[in-house]
Amino acid sequence: MMLPMMYIYRDPPLHYGLCIFLDVGAVNVFPIFLQMATWRPSENKVYLPPTPVSKVVATDSYVKRTSIFYHAGSSRLLAVGHPYYSVTKDNTKTNIPKVSAYQYRVFRVRLPDPNKFGLPDTNIYNPDQERLVWACVGLEVGRGQPLGAGLSGHPLFNRLDDTESSNLANNNVIEDSRDNISVDGKQTQLCIVGCTPAMGEHWTKGAVCKSTQVTTGDCPPLALINTPIEDGDMIDTGFGAMDFKVLQESKAEVPLDIVQSTCKYPDYLKMSADAYGDSMWFYLRREQLFARHYFNRAGKVGETIPAELYLKGSNGREPPPSSVYVATPSGSMITSEAQLFNKPYWLQRAQGHNNGICWGNQLFVTVVDTTRSTNMTISTATEQLSKYDARKINQYLRHVEEYELQFVFQLCKITLSAEVMAYLHNMNANLLEDWNIGLSPPVATSLEDKYRYVRSTAITCQREQPPTEKQDPLAKYKFWDVNLQDSFSTDLDQFPLGRKFLMQLGTRSKPAVATSKKRSAPTSTSTPAKRKRR
C-alpha cells in the first residue's frame, strides 16, 4: 500500500485547487477534486481622477502696473423716444425709437491701442519683449434730469376682480373684462462693469419630450436660458424675467412696454463663477418694490383647484372663481439719498481673476436707473382753439435720458514670456493676433504638392484666397458705442474725476504759473524829516 500523494496546483491568476490521488494496490483508484474559493475582480465602479486643467491665475500675477494714469470722458449722451413702443410711419423704417427707463443701457467703450499710443516716456517698455494694456482704476457714471416716477400700463389689462378689497366671489365671467390699468414698475439702480458684455437670464418655452402627449391649451414646459444683455433690452419691472411674447399669448397680462418683449435679469451667479472674471469686475445694485394692487386673471383656470381644498358652494360659486392671482408692483418713494450715480468708484480688487484689465481695448458699462423715469406728455392742437375741446388735441409721450461717463485708466505692461503667451492664447487667441504675434503652425508630417508654374492654366487654380477681414464677434449685438480714442489726457487735475483721484492718492498738482514773492514797496515816497536838537 502506497501513501496518498497530495498535489496543490495553481492556475494563475484566478483559480486555486487541491487534488488528492490514492493508490491502493489493485483497488480502483479515483481522484478527488476539492474546489476552493475563486477570486474575481471587483464589480464596483472605479473612479479615476479628473483630467487636470490649466489653473486660472489673477491678472496681477503677470501684469505690471506703471505710474502713468490717464483720464478719459465722454460727451453728454442723450436719448429721446417713446417710452412704450417704437413708432413707425407709412410702413417704413422706425421714425421714433423706443426709449424707456426700464431698458438696459449698455455702453461699449472703445479705447485706443496703448501700443500705438503717444507715451510721455518712450522708455517705459520694450516693444520687443513687452506689450501694453489698460487697467480701469476708477469711473463715474453721471446722470442728468430730475428724479421722477414714470408710469406704464395697458388700456386692456387682464384683470377680473380686485381681490384685495372685500367682494363676493362668483364665477360670472363676461367675455371681455379687461380694464385700463397703469403701474409704476420696480425701482432699480444697477451698474455692471467688465470687458465683455454682461450675461442675462430669462425663462422661455422649453422643448417637449416626444413621449409626452400635448394638446392645444396645455401649459408649455419652461427653460432657463442665458443671453448677453444688449442695449435696449427690458429689465424686470416686477412681473418676472420671461419672454412675454412667447409665454403670454393674450397680450393683456403686462404693461405695453413689455407685452411683446423679453425681460432679462442679470445672471449674477454665472458671472461670479466665470473663470476669468471678464464679464463682471464689480457691480452696484439697488432694488425695491412692494405690491400695490391685487387682482385675479380672467379666463379658464387650466389647472383646477383640487376638490379636497374647499367645500362646494352654490349661487354661481361652483366652480370657484379664478384663482390665478397677480399683484401690480410699485417702486415706492424715490429720494436723492439712495442714489448710486453721480459719485466716483475706485477699483482696488475685482471680484474675479481679472482685476480691471481691458482686454481688446474695450469695456462694457451696463446701466439701469428707474429713479429718473418721468414720461413727458406733449399736447398739440389740430386747429386754433377758442375753448377747450379734447377731441381737437393730440397727446404724445416722450422719455429722455442723459448720461456722462468718466474713467481713470492706468497704463500696464505684460512681459511676453513663453508661459504668459501660452496662457493668453488659451484664454483668448485674438489677443496675440491683435498684438501682431503669430504662432508657428505645426510641421507637416505628410507629403504636400507644390507646383512650379502656379499661374499656368494647365493646372488647377493655385491662387491664394485673399485673407478675410477680421470680423467683430459682437457685431450681431446692439450696444451704445462710445469712442474714447481721442479723449485720453494725463492732466488729471483738469477734470472732475481726475481731481478726485488725485485727492485719493494724496497728491496735489503743482501750480501752472509760479508766482515770486517780493517785498512790498512803500506806499509813500517821502520820508519824515528829522527833528533838530536845540
UniProtKB/Swiss-Prot annotation:
Pfam families: Late_protein_L1. Keywords: Capsid protein, Disulfide bond, Host nucleus, Host-virus interaction, Late protein, T=7 icosahedral capsid protein, Viral attachment to host cell, Viral penetration into host cytoplasm, Virion, Virus endocytosis by host, Virus entry into host cell. Residues 508-534 are annotated as: Disordered. One of its GO terms (biological process) is virion attachment to host cell. The keyword Plastid does not apply. GO terms for molecular function: structural molecule activity. It is found in: Virion; Host nucleus. One of its GO terms (cellular component) is host cell nucleus. Coiled coil: none annotated. InterPro entries: Capsid_L1_Papillomavir (IPR002210), Capsid_L1_sf_Papillomavir (IPR036973), dsDNA_vir_gr_I_capsid (IPR011222). Gene3D superfamilies: Major capsid L1 (late) superfamily, Papillomavirus. HAMAP family: PPV_L1 (MF_04002). Belongs to the papillomaviridae L1 protein family. Self-assembles into homopentamers. The capsid has an icosahedral symmetry and consists of 72 capsomers, with each capsomer being a pentamer of L1. Interacts with the minor capsid protein L2; this interaction is necessary for viral genome encapsidation. Interacts with protein E2; this interaction enhances E2-dependent replication and transcription activation. Forms an icosahedral capsid with a T=7 symmetry and a 50 nm diameter. The capsid is composed of 72 pentamers linked to each other by disulfide bonds and associated with L2 proteins. Binds to heparan sulfate proteoglycans on cell surface of basal layer keratinocytes to provide initial virion attachment. This binding mediates a conformational change in the virus capsid that facilitates efficient infection. The virion enters the host cell via endocytosis. During virus trafficking, L1 protein dissociates from the viral DNA and the genomic DNA is released to the host nucleus. This is Major capsid protein L1. It comes from Human papillomavirus 56.
